[in-house]
From Swiss-Prot:
ATP binds at R228, D229, E230, Q237, E489, G541, M542, D543, R544. Belongs to the class-II aminoacyl-tRNA synthetase family. Type 1 subfamily. It comes from the Bacteria. This is Aspartate--tRNA(Asp/Asn) ligase. GO terms for cellular component: cytoplasm. NCBIfam families: aspS_bact, PRK00476.1. The keyword Ligase applies. It is found in: Cytoplasm. PANTHER family: ASPARTATE--TRNA LIGASE, MITOCHONDRIAL, ASPARTYL/LYSYL-TRNA SYNTHETASE. Homodimer. GO terms for molecular function: aspartate-tRNA ligase activity; aspartate-tRNA(Asn) ligase activity; ATP binding; nucleic acid binding.
Length: 594
């Protein structure tokens, strides 16, 4: 039998009691974390979201409560009444918030029992993640996950407070919207009333927040769910949360200034970390040149070295041919890594092949000389010039990739991060931000043989590049900006196109006919004709931001009910088949690919 709660009222949360509470009569309720029977006295660690309290059952003082405690097991739900007393000398636990006190029980109620657990609820559990996700209600009782979600809630509160103080209005935008397939696939929702037609779940509130600016609301924000039906990676979810903002009558610097204030407030109030403002900025071109990627981790050096001009006339045919064909040659100096074995270098070679590189040339600096199969192809002057470019010293390992610029930058940029992990160059306790600006407006899609928007079709070109949009699309820069933290893009935004003729031009550049643009975006094109203010905004990825703030290894550890990499919720068994009657009401017939 279990007891009913009756008229008992909780007086305190378990993890909040301190020496200041000694002598108080308290009522606590929670889960039994562990039970210890010391041959008379029974000790229970009682847990709630605030932490643990040590509960003492003394048969001499409360025999009935002691009998109840004898039957208690882990994860039973109990309520106790008792007095807060100091722990005996020598038993104080400095690792617990409540470690100086314990509660001497006078009464106890067993509110509910628990089955045997499929896994322990320790801070670190060595168990398959799928088992944890299947029993997510148990997994979420673990302290690390509870702390993650408590911090997430705090970040949401701080965000709303800061943005409201700065004149933003929280306005909801629709979840049932029009499908405008650009980029990732939409999640589609069939309409029962308008059979054969579908809503789409929003990939972002982009167009609606722009229309709110056209409507004169000046500053908008939303902590909003977004949906993308794409192949999932470890750091992606089909549904995710954005801190979404839009501002009228602003330029890039205005948006960045307000958003830096938000980031600084979040880090200060959530983690007691002071973010140095202003955050450094770097152009896209500089990021690619120095780091190979547009989301560089600037906590460490290991920058890419441009070598094309030095080696284009060399006797090493691989390098010379690549340079002659319009490719580039770049390298990395892995300081002190001449000790690497052939197998370790082979592993690095296989790693860069993942990103399209055909191979990885290497040189070891030993005894003041080059040791490498390629050393014989270079003159003494070329070797001296490369040593100077690399800053090469005794014991260094020089690594080279030669290919098309995108392949070279991608592969070396990823190799840079990999080497930083191997060599322990990353200080995991530091947070380093950088804004990336001046992105290309358009990029050529080789598969579809057309131009594609680097960010999205509503990003404005730089004023000075506007006359090149048609004549030289690849040279046009966008009024776009990303915020990168420790090598992770946590926010992206831009100044938007606010003139209809430029928006129509952008759609044409993306290969949309006037009819297609009207069919997909007609309501935006119409709105742009009615006095649209200059405006811009940004969206921060809440899930990734919380993952970095908490030092979590997986984005699934900062979401209450995440999906697997196959898009499934193992706890609720979604997605699942639906009743045939529901399908008939929607005029839908299901055909499953074999």
């Amino acid at each position: 039998m279990t007891d009913m709660l009756g008229d008992w009222k909780r007086s305190h949360l378990c993890g909040t009691l301190t020496k200041a509470d000694v002598g108080k009569q308290v009522t606590l309720m929670g889960w039994v974390m562990r039970r210890r029977d010391h041959g008379g006295l029974i000790f229970i660690d009682l847990r709630d979201r605030e932490g643990l309290a040590q509960i003492v059952f003394d048969p001499a003082k409360a025999p009935e409560a002691h009998r109840e405690a004898e039957a208690v097991r882990n994860e039973y739900v109990v309520a106790i009444k008792g007095e807060v007393v100091p722990r005996p000398e020598g038993t104080v636990n400095p690792n617990m918030k409540t470690g100086e006190v314990e509660i001497l029980v006078t009464q106890c109620k067993l509110l509910n029992r628990s089955k045997a657990l499929p896994f322990t609820l320790d801070d670190y559990v060595d168990v398959a993640e799928n088992l944890r996700l299947k029993h997510r209600y148990l997994d979420l009782r673990r302290t690390p996950l509870q702390q993650n979600l408590i911090l997430r809630s705090r970040v949401s509160q701080v965000t709303r407070q800061y943005l409201t103080e700065n004149g933003f209005l929280e306005i909801e935008t629709p979840f049932l919207t029009k499908s405008t397939p650009e980029g990732a696939r939409d999640f589609l929702v069939p309409s029962r009333i308008n059979q054969g037609n579908f809503y789409a779940l929003p990939q972002s509130p982009q167009i609606f927040k722009q229309i709110l600016m056209i409507s004169g609301f000046d500053r908008y924000f939303q902590v909003v769910r977004c949906f993308r039906d794409e192949d999932l990676r470890a750091d992606r979810q089909p549904e995710f949360t954005q801190i979404d903002c839009e501002l009228s009558f602003v330029d890039r610097d205005d948006v960045i200034a307000v958003m830096e204030g938000l980031i600084a407030r979040i880090f200060k109030e959530a983690k007691e970390i002071d973010v140095q403002l202003p955050i450094p900025r770097m152009t896209y071109a500089e990021a690619i040149r120095r780091y190979g990627v547009d989301n560089p981790d600037v906590r460490f050096g290991l920058e890419l070295v441009e070598l094309t001009d030095i080696v284009k006339g060399s006797g090493f045919k691989v390098f010379a041919d690549v340079a002659a064909g319009g490719g580039i040659i770049k390298g990395l100096n892995a300081k002190g890594c001449a000790r690497f074995s052939r197998k370790e270098i082979d592993d690095l070679t296989e790693f860069v092949k993942i990103y399209g590189a055909k191979g990885l040339a290497y040189v070891k600096i030993e005894g003041g000389e080059w040791h490498s199969p390629i050393a014989k192809f270079f003159t003494a002057q070329e070797i001296a010039d490369m040593n100077r470019a690399f800053g090469a010293e005794e014991g260094d390992l020089l690594l080279f990739v030669a290919d098309k610029p995108k392949v070279v930058n991608d592969s070396l940029g990823k190799l840079r991060n990999q080497l930083a992990q191997i060599l322990g160059l990353v200080d995991k306790g530091t947070f380093k931000f950088v804004w990336i600006t001046d992105f290309p407006l358009l990029e050529w899609d080789e598969e579809e043989k057309r131009w594609a928007a680097v960010h999205h079709p509503f990003t404005a070109p730089m004023d000075e590049d506007l006359d090149k949009v048609e004549s030289d699309p690849g040279a046009c820069r966008a009024k776009a900006y990303d915020l990168v933290l420790n090598g992770n893009e946590i926010g992206g935004g831009s100044i938007r196109i606010h003139q209809q003729h430029i928006q129509s031009l952008m759609f044409r550049m993306l290969g949309l006919s006037e009819e297609e643009a009207r069919a997909k975006f007609g309501f935006l094109l119409d709105a742009l004709e009615f006095g649209t203010p200059p405006h811009g905004g940004i969206a921060f990825g809440m899930d990734r931001l919380i993952m970095l703030l908490t030092g979590s290894d997986s984005i699934r550890d900062v979401i209450a009910f995440p999906k697997t990499q196959k898009g499934a919720c193992l706890m609720s068994d979604a997605p699942s088949p639906v009743d045939s009657k529901q399908l008939r009401e929607l005029a839908i017939k299901v055909t499953v690919k074999q």
